[in-house]
UniProtKB/Swiss-Prot annotation:
Gene3D superfamilies: 1.20.5.170. Residues 2-77 form a coiled coil. Disulfide bonds: none annotated. Pfam families: ATG16. This is Autophagy protein 16. Keywords: Autophagy, Coiled coil, Membrane, Protein transport, Transport. The gene is ATG16. It comes from the Eukaryota. Homodimer. Part of the ATG5-ATG12/ATG16 complex. Several units of each may be present in this complex. GO terms for cellular component: phagophore assembly site membrane.
């Protein structure tokens, strides 16, 4: 009789431990799912930021090229104006 009670007690203890392990596993599984969701959100954000960065870099490059073109045009106009002024001064000096 004592042996039967001991087996029952051991079985109950093992069943309780098994339930605790199942609960812990379920909790860890849920945590893993939440972390996976968070990781996906971070990856999506990172991708969106990378796309924005690429767009901004392209705009920056275009603006730098436009600026260079405008500076060249301004320098050319200033040189043309200076040439005209020099020609006018030369004409007046005759």
């Amino acid at each position: 009789m004592q042996l039967n009670v001991t087996h029952r007690t051991n079985a109950e203890r093992l069943e309780k431990h098994n339930r605790e392990l199942e609960t812990a596993l379920a909790k860890k599984t849920e945590e893993h799912k939440e972390q996976a969701k968070a990781l996906l959100l971070l990856q999506d954000d990172m991708l969106a930021n990378q796309i924005q960065l690429n767009v901004l870099e392209q705009k920056t490059e275009a603006l730098q090229q436009e600026n260079e073109t405008l500076v060249q045009r301004l320098v050319a106009k200033a040189a043309a104006d200076a040439d005209k002024m020099n020609d006018a001064n030369a004409f007046l000096e005759r």
